[in-house]
């Protein structure tokens, strides 16, 4: 069992982060924030997918102006993403955001960062210190020669110490780079020296399978080491995919369970059914199920039930038929044309019982 790193607990709106709270899944909208309707529609989709905190970009004044309505109508806490324009941090807090994300390296003078922190303290707004390889302080680049893991960690520790000195503790830190091992090492260095909650992810991971794999490896390593209080899978894709991927990573490590986890055999010469087609149909029809269930779809009856005995329910497919099984025991033989519908009926019954029977 994974032993999670002990961190202090903070709050972003009504969401607890760190301490004994579960790891929180975040994402970021890809809409123009000033397009309130599009932004709220995407926030709704993210929320329905399981997102618990959402970040929005505020590069322009019109984006800041849109925040009040977005915050008011959002079903989850909203974080304003601030870069290069410290005035937008103050304005965003006036509009009621629950948190702000700043990169001190591109904000400017230390006095300005402190003023932002003092305002956040006054308003009860959480702050995320964002450190990444693309905007490291000049003196650290000169010291290390490049954005090394040590340089990134030192930057994060430097600003963390300043926040503590200023009497502000409702903050978390993110240390991100596009290199997986550098990212892991930087977070490990920071985690060994402080109890500040960490937001983890791999920046600029890319799109499709490559982006998902890169993020899964980087995030998975840190989570296995007990590091990470909030997580975002950064992909060049629909942000809903980020949320879905984050939950798959957490489910794989036994850290969160939400919705259906489908397991299926890799196929071999024994299968008598178009298994990829069946799995895809099952995935699509179960996408709206919120009850944590493990569903197995196996391509033959030889070892299927034994191999999938840890599943809550599943199908072991044969030629023209399938065995429907629950908790490792066959309960019904069904025709191939009816097997998916029979599986769905049984899952609906399990949902009514809370997934236990």
UniProtKB/Swiss-Prot annotation:
The highest taxon in the source lineage is Bacteria
Catalytic reaction list: (2E)-4-hydroxy-3-methylbut-2-enyl diphosphate + oxidized [flavodoxin] + H2O + 2 H(+) = 2-C-methyl-D-erythritol 2,4-cyclic diphosphate + reduced [flavodoxin]
Give one Pfam family.
GcpE
Q: What is the recorded phenotype of mutating residue 55 to K?
A: Loss of activity
Q: What is the effect of changing residue 256 to K?
A: Reduces activity 2-fold
Q: Which GO terms describe its biological process?
A: isopentenyl diphosphate biosynthetic process, methylerythritol 4-phosphate pathway; terpenoid biosynthetic process
The UniProt transmembrane annotation reads none
Q: What does this protein do?
A: Converts 2C-methyl-D-erythritol 2,4-cyclodiphosphate (ME-2,4cPP) into 1-hydroxy-2-methyl-2-(E)-butenyl 4-diphosphate.
Q: How does it assemble?
A: Homodimer.
Q: What is this protein called?
A: 4-hydroxy-3-methylbut-2-en-1-yl diphosphate synthase (flavodoxin)
Species source reads Aquifex aeolicus (strain VF5)
